[in-house]
Amino acid sequence: MSTDDGRRPIRRALISVYDKTGLVDLAQGLSAAGVEIISTGSTAKTIADTGIPVTPVEQLTGFPEVLDGRVKTLHPRVHAGLLADLRKSEHAAALEQLGIEAFELVVVNLYPFSQTVESGASVDDCVEQIDIGGPAMVRAAAKNHPSAAVVTDPLGYHGVLAALRAGGFTLAERKRLASLAFQHIAEYDIAVASWMQQTLAPEHPVAAFPQWFGRSWRRVAMLRYGENPHQQAALYGDPTAWPGLAQAEQLHGKDMSYNNFTDADAAWRAAFDHEQTCVAIIKHANPCGIAISSVSVADAHRKAHECDPLSAYGGVIAANTEVSVEMAEYVSTIFTEVIVAPGYAPGALDVLARKKNIRVLVAAEPLAGGSELRPISGGLLIQQSDQLDAHGDNPANWTLATGSPADPATLTDLVFAWRACRAVKSNAIVIAADGATVGVGMGQVNRVDAARLAVERGGERVRGAVAASDAFFPFPDGLETLAAAGVTAVVHPGGSVRDEEVTEAAAKAGVTLYLTGARHFAH
């Protein structure tokens, strides 16, 4: 019998949980309300050990637990009680004829499959943690939400006790619980299917791009808005992935915005493109400045900021090492939206916290590799993340097209400029000197304009500097622009039908020119 709002009293509960958190309190509350509890294995033992009345499921089924616990609840006397739609008189009559009672509440959580995989367990141990009976019970109860409520998370137990006091769950509440239950099962199944695909049955030769692709995310936070105030937005995290910015700890400041996250992600990745101590300053997903230093992180930040102080105002800063007090003192004099680092030296956070609004994050080092997803109309593009690990990213594999071989200092700057170029939106030209960008031309629809922009931003600092281009020069004009401004050495992928003309222009200008054979477009 249910009320006008579909509230159905709870008389009988089936409980089978791996995670015993809150179990005893839940069982005590159910028992005190007169609810009959049927349970399985270790769950039943935990309840019984506290003196709470509980019926073992094998007593209900008349069939023992077998096959090392693989079969406990896969029985008609269980699933008929889960699936009977009590709105239908014929279902109620069938239960009565069979001597089966319905369950109004099912509390189940599943074997820890993902945690077992993450622990490095053997294949057999992982397979053993693929739950069968649990998902079957959850799906059955969720399907039958007009008659039963299902709870899969210990955080929901307080809601069960509240519903008991109110006379049961309403239909609307059972619908919500059913939705959560199916989400839980879907996430679990995706984890199992993905692991099976990658570990037991990889496809060849395109194992990285299988016929089926599944992934699940959980909402971490609601954001004030998206890129613009009229766009709603939220942050989601992948619970199975290496911890990243979505899991970063915020130590100080206002809540992160959508744009804060996109810029912080670009800055974080740019800083870790370099092995030396590095600081990247990002605005609208493009670098205002990137610099490395063998002296200190404060020195790297100073050099990065000097590249374009005007654009760095309101920027996002990332460091690939601990932020020192000295760097924090400098940052505190500049309007900065976000700073993210693997850690902060004693006293550095106190200095940064003088600024009420600066967002201070600490995050784990980004994991190399992985895939990038980009939605398009009607589908999704997936590609391997662009890492600086191509054959041509190693300067030992570069080809000297013209000019004298670069001396060690010049070659070091060329390597830095080449690696910094990956973080710049195409078409990209980076001019660098002394381990720092001095002029960045980004996001232009032709390469000569990118060169002009980089030269304009670099000013007098361009003379004697080096430059990198993320893709080949399609015409000599881009290289000629750099040479005319005083650039002495350039590195680019090569591969244009006009490579010979570009090389001739470099030779004529006395510019050393290297070819990498690798490209780093970023759109």
From Swiss-Prot:
Gene3D superfamilies: 3.40.140.20, Methylglyoxal synthase-like domain. It holds the Pfam family MGS. Keywords: Hydrolase, Multifunctional enzyme, Purine biosynthesis, Transferase. Belongs to the PurH family. It catalyses: (6R)-10-formyltetrahydrofolate + 5-amino-1-(5-phospho-beta-D-ribosyl)imidazole-4-carboxamide = 5-formamido-1-(5-phospho-D-ribosyl)imidazole-4-carboxamide + (6S)-5,6,7,8-tetrahydrofolate; IMP + H2O = 5-formamido-1-(5-phospho-D-ribosyl)imidazole-4-carboxamide. This is Bifunctional purine biosynthesis protein PurH. SUPFAM superfamilies: Cytidine deaminase-like, Methylglyoxal synthase-like. GO terms for molecular function: IMP cyclohydrolase activity; phosphoribosylaminoimidazolecarboxamide formyltransferase activity. Its EC number is 2.1.2.3, 3.5.4.10. GO terms for cellular component: cytosol; plasma membrane. Pathway: Purine metabolism; IMP biosynthesis via de novo pathway; 5-formamido-1-(5-phospho-D-ribosyl)imidazole-4-carboxamide from 5-amino-1-(5-phospho-D-ribosyl)imidazole-4-carboxamide (10-formyl THF route): step 1/1; Purine metabolism; IMP biosynthesis via de novo pathway; IMP from 5-formamido-1-(5-phospho-D-ribosyl)imidazole-4-carboxamide: step 1/1. Residues 1-152 form the MGS-like domain. The keyword Transferase applies. It comes from Mycobacterium tuberculosis (strain ATCC 25618 / H37Rv). The IMP cyclohydrolase activity resides in the N-terminal region. One of its GO terms (biological process) is 'de novo' IMP biosynthetic process.
